[in-house]
């Protein structure tokens, strides 16, 4: 027969496990939102080049290089957020894709001007790198991003009003002041 202390300990242990699972679920959802933000930004600002977009403790961010020198404004953030909501409503799926020919993918990124993605892929080419594809209901790829994942199965897991773009800040590529200053959009979900 277990003692009261052991029973309480087990309850606490189960609670901690459940909270860790909830935190991981939230991290995956936020990371998926960062991809949706990148997709929205590239639709509205085709000159935008993608750097990185992880989930962080209180939300997520994505770093962009607007090659025409445009600086994101509050009005831009409103438009990006609205486009994100439109993307979410489409019930798009996220699909993991193992890159079969890494050198070819690096060349494609370079041809598209996606120098940051090319640099990251070059660095991780021996790690079985993957893209995450965002697809519509007919299987058409609408967006792809270099990413290890994981992601939510589809955008219906996100409530459109549960995302909020917060601010723009400068961020040096890879945190190195000798590198180019990018624009980081912070958000939460």
List each model region and its residues.
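Active/ligand-binding-proximal structured segments within catalytic/core domains
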Residues: 27-45
